[in-house]
């Protein structure tokens, strides 16, 4: 309890937690029902849904390298986060007046345009939000995992609300996402503890400040891929997270909702289930850093693998 109160006394922790909470809430309010929306409201087949997700992932993969390079040059500045928030505000108008008509007139053109927007505003933006939060945690004396956990909490609350909004009017989930993004932009612009010299002097870790002042060269970035340990981690992520994500996002929602008498009942139940799952994720993200310090990173990963195998 003492550690939690100490964390909340840190303005950098409070601001970073709120920003990442709003990002995941604004994304989760519609993303948690994206597959259901595509199949039940737009009538697309599983193959078409897979195509839409694949296009989005492909564009996001390219953008992640671009975004990563840009953020390295910006350092702690939140310029890109503000840009993402502006793009996210457009999610309601985009889905209502652009995406649906384009998919109806030409599926592949609509899928490509949608992939670009989703990657720019959400899919490739997510790692940037997480990376900035992680950098801030090292520089301003707070635990990254405990700040990132608030993102899962925001997603959990959003998923719970989405189930009820979706059954009322599917478009509500997108427009609510726009509203949350607008609040996020206000927070990004107005809450800037890093501009307060007294707060910076109190919480800044000087050694991390010196590290941040050095921007890695292109050669240093490429040099990372020569490390065997990096490739081990890449293979691990591909063989675990990728398969889980495809099942979780594209297959499970439709599978689960079939067990209910009406589509509406299934959609509401899925929203509740998804919310509970992400809320447990929120709790674990606060506890895992403590566990990792006790047993080590390697053993923590092996424990995670054992749980996934079950």
Which residue stretches match the model-derived regions?
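Helix-to-loop junctions at the C-terminal end of transmembrane segments
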Residues: 62-76, 165-166, 283-297
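Primarily marks hydrophobic transmembrane alpha-helices of the MFS/SLC 12-helix fold
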Residues: 80-81, 301
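Symmetry-related core transmembrane helices of the 12-TM Major Facilitator Superfamily/SLC fold
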Residues: 158, 173-190
């Amino acid at each position: 309890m003492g550690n939690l109160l100490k964390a909340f006394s840190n303005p950098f922790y409070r601001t970073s937690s709120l920003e990442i909470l709003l990002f995941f809430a604004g994304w989760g309010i519609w993303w948690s029902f994206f597959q259901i929306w595509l199949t039940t409201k737009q009538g697309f087949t599983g193959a078409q849904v897979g195509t839409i997700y694949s296009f989005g992932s492909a564009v996001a993969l390219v953008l992640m390298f671009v975004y990563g390079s840009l953020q390295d040059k910006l350092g702690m500045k939140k310029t890109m986060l503000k840009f993402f928030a502006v793009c996210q505000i457009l999610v309601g108008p985009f889905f209502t007046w652009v995406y649906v008509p384009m998919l109806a007139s030409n599926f592949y053109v609509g899928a490509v345009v949608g992939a670009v927007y989703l990657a720019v505003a959400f899919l490739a933006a997510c790692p940037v939000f997480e990376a900035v939060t992680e950098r801030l945690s090292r520089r301003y004396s707070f635990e990254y995992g405990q700040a990132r956990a608030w993102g899962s909490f925001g997603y959990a609350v959003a998923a719970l609300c989405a189930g009820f909004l979706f059954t009322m009017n599917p478009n509500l989930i997108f427009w609510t996402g726009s509203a949350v993004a607008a609040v996020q932009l206000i927070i990004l612009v107005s809450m800037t503890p890093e501009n307060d010299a007294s707060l910076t002097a109190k919480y800044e870790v000087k050694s991390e400040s010196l590290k941040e002042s050095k921007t890695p060269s292109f050669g240093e970035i490429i040099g990372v891929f020569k490390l065997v340990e990096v490739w081990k981690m890449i293979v691990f992520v591909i063989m675990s997270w990728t398969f889980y994500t495809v099942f979780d996002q594209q297959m499970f929602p439709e599978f689960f909702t079939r067990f209910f008498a009406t589509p509406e009942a299934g959609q509401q139940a899925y929203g509740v289930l998804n919310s509970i799952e992400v809320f447990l994720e929120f709790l674990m993200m606060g506890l895992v850093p403590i566990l990792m310090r006790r047993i080590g990173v390697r053993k923590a990963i092996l424990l995670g693998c054992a749980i996934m195998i079950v």
